[in-house]
From Swiss-Prot:
Region (Disordered): 30-49
Originating species: Picrophilus torridus (strain ATCC 700027 / DSM 9790 / JCM 10055 / NBRC 100828 / KAW 2/3)
Gene3D superfamilies, per the entry: 1.10.287.310
Name used for this protein in its record: Large ribosomal subunit protein uL29
Record GO terms (molecular function): structural constituent of ribosome
Recorded family membership: Belongs to the universal ribosomal protein uL29 family.
Gene label: rpl29
Amino acid sequence: MELRAKALREMSDEELNEKLSSLKESLLRERSSVAMGGAPSSPGKMRSIRRQIARVLTVMEEKKR
């Protein structure tokens, strides 16, 4: 599921922190499966997760200002 910045801006700080932690966990699972010699569930999934994490962090920084 692709996260849009508009939807992220409507979330509270607590929701953003929860989303960030869940995204980091899913990235960790993908990386560990690749490290154990398995193939990722889809080739672009890790890239997508990294970009979603960046979006969440960007919105969190915007809210600090």
